């Protein structure tokens, strides 16, 4: 189990829950962004490099985030299908940034109402994270199983940058 070092309570909690016979290792990584992509995470945690033609399982690894692990547990142990999701609503344009446990299929518009709506008109609304998220042109779309966040950004929060030949391949991060 890999956890970044900026989450000391999670590290302690997981370590206390693991029994020696579980044969589970907790690997604490230095906090670094971006580091959450599968290949980056495997390299940081194990030192193994995976070519783009290979899968994580080829390196003896499975990479799942906590939401996926919980969904697997609920499906296998509780016979509960994936019907809910924790969604973070944040950004300076939203009145009350919050985390919500919502039903899949709920409209982002409804979730925003739960966060008090906009306190100022957003310059950009993104579903997902700031690096890999997707801009929404309307919040009248449903939350789906891979939704994790709704970023409601003001003009000041939206990065202004010059166009460049960079395709964000990540090569210069190593």
PLM features: what roles do these ranges have?
Residues 1-3:
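Short catalytic-loop micro-motif centered on adjacent basic/acidic residues
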Residues 5-108, 114-121, 129:
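Hydrophobic alpha-helical positions that pack around
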Residues 87-89, 119-148:
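Ubiquitin-like/PB1-type beta-grasp interaction modules and other compact soluble beta-rich domains
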Residues 143-154, 159:
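Glycine-rich and small/hydrophobic secondary-structure elements
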Residues 107-108, 130-134, 157-158:
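Short, catalytically relevant binding-site loops at active-site mouths
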Residues 12-13, 38-39, 136-139, 162-163:
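Short, well-ordered secondary-structure micro-motifs
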Residues 159-174:
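Cysteine-centered iron-sulfur cluster-binding motifs in ferredoxin-type domains/subunits
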């Amino acid at each position: 189990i890999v956890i970044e070092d900026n989450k000391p309570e999670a590290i302690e909690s997981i370590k206390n829950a693991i029994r020696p016979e579980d044969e589970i290792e907790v690997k604490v990584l230095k906090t670094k962004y971006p580091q959450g992509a599968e290949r980056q995470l495997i390299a940081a945690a194990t030192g193994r490099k995976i070519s783009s033609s290979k899968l994580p399982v080829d390196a003896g690894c499975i990479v799942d985030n906590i939401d996926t692990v919980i969904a697997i547990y609920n499906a296998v142990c509780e016979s509960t299908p994936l019907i809910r999701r924790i969604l973070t609503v944040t950004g300076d344009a939203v009145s009350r940034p919050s985390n919500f446990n919502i039903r899949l299929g709920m409209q982002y518009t409804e979730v925003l109402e739960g966060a008090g709506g906009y306190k100022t008109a957003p310059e950009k609304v993104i579903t997902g994270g700031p690096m890999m998220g997707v801009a929404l042109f309307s919040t009248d779309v449903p939350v789906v199983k891979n939704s994790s966040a709704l970023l409601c950004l003001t003009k000041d929060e939206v990065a202004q940058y010059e166009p460049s030949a960079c395709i964000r391949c990540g090569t210069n991060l190593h």
